[in-house]
Amino acid sequence: MKVIYVNHTIPLYTHPLLQKIVDKGCELVMLLPLGDNGTVGKGVEVSQSNNNAYRICFSSSSKRWYGKVALMDLKSILIQERPDILMIGWPYMLQFFFERELRKTVKHFNIKLIFQEIPFQTPPFGQLSYFKEHPCYNEDMELISSGIRFKLQALLTMYIRKRIYRLVSATINYATCAYDILPSYGVNKESIFVRYNTGDTDALFDARKQIEKKERMLSERPRIIHVGRLVKWKRVDILIEAFKTVIKEIPDCELVIVGKGPEKDSLTQQVIEYGLDNNVVFTGGIYDPLVLGQYMYESSVYVLAGMGGLSINDAMGYSLPIICSVCDGTEKDLVTDGVNGYFFKEGSATDLAEKIIAILSNPTKAKQMGEESYRVIRDKINLGTVSQRYIDAFNYVMNQ
């Protein structure tokens, strides 16, 4: 079967997954916009691999009158490639609402549509009150879910989504929250496929075997680690604030912050102002999997204070207990509160500090939690299982 997968780019972590999908018998074509159209997050590392089992093609893109980017060559590429399946996400899915000719092309060539999303910042249909309990922020932590204009736009988006869902044969989603949200838009539960999110767990497991044989790289002490882009919505500032309390209870504790980004200077200044510079290490970005893996392996707990990412998966692959808040929903499929980590109250440095102290002060419990983290990655959410969920979705739509 031939699948065209439309995406903003090919993130570094996505490349191994695409390779695995091809290995399972799928002819895969990645369709990307030419150039930087502003849809890729700040600091996202992009795959530079030229050794691809999948093909890559490009389309010119343009911001349309409705305010979102569209692929100008999508129709002609579909006519030329004649795929069995088109897998597409936001905002490119909007083209099927606004462009009648595109809908006609898909119908004429009997192309099955799959909508891929988390879903993130998506309320159940008709429930604008959702945004009171779940306010939306951009990467700079600016509130975007307020005002009459936002409410009208959100209401219109609900009806557009409902129409789009009628056009698709299936949805592929990153998180099980899709089962709670999408049926309210009329989506049949059997057509909802939750694939979860994963990095290259094959490489991670291989790296771990090598690291287990190495001498220690870091001193032996209680160690908190955070990995991610240094942008505001990762809330590293809250982690540093919580660490100020943790260090009073556990004086020899160390906080390692891995990553780069626009917030580096302000976070460094915060550390200095709190007098924590002897206990906080900024490593910058680390892209050698053995070096990053050894930092994980020699740490005691992984903490994500803000918006999620695959670093949770990686930390679990190194048997670390996890502390995070509920953000985009993907973390709820990885972390079971009290079993392999804790959820802390979003935005609360006090609660975060209490959770960190609870883990660091009980090494036996921390080890049990870490073992459970590893089991989740080994058995449930890894390169093999996630790629198979794609294949299951593809087979489902082809058999309709």
Task: Indicate residue ranges for each PLM-predicted region.
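Donor nucleotide-sugar binding/catalytic pocket of nucleotide-sugar-dependent glycosyltransferases
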Residues: 150-211, 219, 314
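A short, well-ordered alpha-helix in the C-terminal region of glycosyltransferases
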Residues: 252, 351, 358, 365-380, ...
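Conserved acidic donor-binding segment of nucleotide-sugar-dependent glycosyltransferases
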Residues: 337-338, 342-349, 358-364
